[in-house]
């Protein structure tokens, strides 16, 4: 799976669970993607910050921070 695809899937799941699942569970999901090498440390850090701020992650994030371009 490419970094772009991984990031899209992860962001979709994070947005879907916003306000439904605890922040700890959402952070664990990000951690699991990072541990599998599916996202970079920079992406990991930015997503953790977004989760802690309870932000919706839009497509611009994926465009700006994907490793594929």
Residue locations for each model-derived region?
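Short acidic DE-rich linear segments
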Residues: 2, 64-69
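Acidic, low-complexity, intrinsically disordered interaction modules
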Residues: 18-66
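N-terminal acidic leader/helix
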Residues: 2-25
